[in-house]
Amino acid sequence: ATRASGSASATGERGSASATGGSGSASATGGSGSASATGWSGSASATGGRGSASATGWGGSASATGGSGSASATGGSGSASATGWRGAAITTGEYSTVECGKDGIAVSTADEVTWIARPGAVFVHRYEGIRSTRSLKIATFKGTKATDGERITFKCGKIVKRVMP
């Protein structure tokens, strides 16, 4: 779907769906499917095992719920969620939210990001910070003494806010 508020859906095995207009949505429900939404405030969802979802517009959201799925959100204030077992979720936009499931990995390259902590999960925070010095912070569920579902906001590698579920 290429117009504003359009939607696209693929339900077969290895299908793909793409929505490029503002507020568009794309969904792929078959195993190994992919979904992409590139417009402002778009959403993409892949629910099959090893599926991938990507949202590139500002405020977009991407979700992959199958095992070993991946989700990516590259716009500011976007969110990425890969809740299946061993999934990966990546955000690059400032003030975004990232979440992965058990034994998964969540990654962000934004200076300020919120991680939704899950047991066994790892969060990798690559940030630039002041004076353009690139740094890396690796946080674990256990190491942060998090509660399942707790929203932990990092700014330049430091925890600045914690919100219990």
What are these regions (language model features)?
Residues 1-164:
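Periodic small-residue-enriched repeat registers in elongated scaffold domains
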